[in-house]
Curated annotation (Swiss-Prot):
Binds to 23S rRNA. Forms part of two intersubunit bridges in the 70S ribosome. CDD domains: Ribosomal_uL14. GO terms for cellular component: cytosolic large ribosomal subunit. It comes from the Archaea. The keyword Cell membrane does not apply. This is Large ribosomal subunit protein uL14. One of its GO terms (molecular function) is structural constituent of ribosome. It comes from Thermoplasma volcanium (strain ATCC 51530 / DSM 4299 / JCM 9571 / NBRC 15438 / GSS1). GO terms for biological process: translation. The keyword Transferase does not apply. Belongs to the universal ribosomal protein uL14 family. Part of the 50S ribosomal subunit. Forms a cluster with proteins L3 and L24e, part of which may contact the 16S rRNA in 2 intersubunit bridges.
Amino acid sequence: MKGIAGREIRGLPLGANIVCADNTGARSISLIDVKAYHGKARRIPAAGVGDMFIASVKKGTPEMRSKVVYAVVIRQKRPYRRPDGTMVEFEDNAAVLVTPDGEVRGSEIKGPVAREAAERWPRIAAIASIIV
C-alpha cells in the first residue's frame, strides 16, 4: 500500500451500503469500521476512495452472507477534486474485497476503478479493466 497525496474527501460514513464490484460472491456490503482512521472526538468515521475498511456482507451467496470482510473503496458518488483541478464523481459507491494484507480476493473487477485507488493498491490496478 502506498500513501495518498493531497486532501481526501471521505464520502462513505459508517453504515453506508456499498456495491461489491468483484466476483467473490458478495453483492452488497455495509461499512462497519475504517482502518487507520484518525478523526476527531465524537465524529463518525468515514471512508473515501482508496481507503481500506471492515464491512459486513448484506447480500450475496449463502456462504458469503453475514461474514465480516475487509474491502477497499474503488468508486464513490461524492465528488472530489484531483490536484490538477478536475472534479471526479462516479455513478455508485463500490468496493472490492481484500485480505487484511491487501491482496485482492476476487479475480476480476466490474466497472471502472478510480486512479487514486489503483495507485495506492497495485494488486487492484493489476486486475482492473478500466482506470479513470
